[in-house]
């Protein structure tokens, strides 16, 4: 790996590692969890053809507390959540177990966890800006200052 910041590396390079540090941090800090969603399915070159609610299946199911958990990582730049992922998360949150977003900051070496509905309030009340990925997909750019970090 070069000294280039992670977010500036090519997608193919980031794909090899994305989520690993954040998911390890989640597993170390939580109990009663089981892997639920996809973790870079090998050999599935057309994964992006699947419906969003399948592609964006939450990473974990947890029994105590009872919830679905989507884990994401961030560094110095804002957290970027694709609009299509937000739509899928809304579908998952409609099930009987609430959906939480669990965010690991490699910069802070700390985590934030927020219910999906609270995340939507953060986005709406703070007029979170939209951005565009190179391939044209829109995302919400959420400042780390808006997230409820552990111990704050």
Which residues does each PLM region occupy?
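Short catalytic/ligand-binding loop motif for oxyanion handling, primarily in non-cytosolic enzymes
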Residues: 70, 77-78, 108-113
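A structural signal for short, well-ordered beta-strand segments and their strand-loop junctions
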Residues: 37, 68-70, 100-103
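Nucleic-acid nuclease catalytic cores
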Residues: 90-119
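Active-site-adjacent loop/helix micro-motif of nuclease/hydrolase catalytic cores
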Residues: 75-86
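Conserved catalytic cores of phosphodiester-cleaving nucleases, focusing on short active-site segments
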Residues: 30, 58-75
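Active-site metal-binding core of divalent-cation-utilizing nuclease and nuclease-like domains
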Residues: 2-16, 35-65
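Conserved alpha-helical elements of sugar-nucleotide-dependent glycosyltransferases
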Residues: 18-26, 84-88
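Charged phosphate-binding loop/patch that engages nucleotide di/tri-phosphates or the phosphate backbone
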Residues: 2, 130-152
């Amino acid at each position: 790996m070069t000294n280039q910041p992670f977010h500036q590396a090519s997608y193919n390079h980031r794909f090899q590692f994305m989520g690993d540090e954040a998911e390890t941090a989640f597993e170390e800090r939580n109990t009663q969890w089981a892997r639920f969603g996809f973790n870079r399915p090998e050999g599935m070159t057309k994964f992006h053809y699947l419906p969003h609610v399948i592609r964006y299946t939450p990473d974990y199911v947890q029994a105590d507390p009872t919830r679905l958990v989507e884990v994401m990582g961030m560094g110095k730049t804002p957290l970027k959540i694709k609009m299509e992922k937000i739509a899928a998360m809304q579908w998952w949150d409609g099930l009987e177990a609430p959906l939480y977003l669990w965010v690991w900051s490699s910069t802070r070496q700390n985590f934030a966890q927020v219910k999906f509905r609270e995340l939507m309030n953060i986005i709406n009340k703070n007029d979170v800006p939209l951005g565009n990925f190179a391939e044209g997909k829109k995302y919400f750019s959420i400042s780390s200052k808006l997230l409820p970090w552990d111990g704050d």
